[in-house]
Amino acid sequence: MGEVILRDTVVYCAAEQYGLEDLKRLALRKQGLQIGIPADVILRSARFAYDNTPDSDSRLRAHYLALIIRSRKTFKRSGTMQMEMELGSKLYFDLFVAMCNHMDDLTEIR
């Protein structure tokens, strides 16, 4: 396969599998320090996170939703998002809900 996935996401998911809460926190903190991540890597890593964490573990998932929303200009220019959305997964419904909430928050500020 050889596709790039963010290392801290893999570490977080392994820590989830083995119940290592401190390692999960560290991996999530380190993940938040990264910048300039290509859109395709973000989406692949988000898909990996969704495939390897339970629905009840929202920390890593929320991180990816926020990252996609913050990077929305990049995703608008990228054909990667359209292709991924056509494949469909729970990630995209969660993203829709998160973006609606984000828009509601912006509306309330005005």
Task: Spell out what each predicted region is.
Residues 1-17, 21-110:
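BTB/POZ-protein C-terminal extensions
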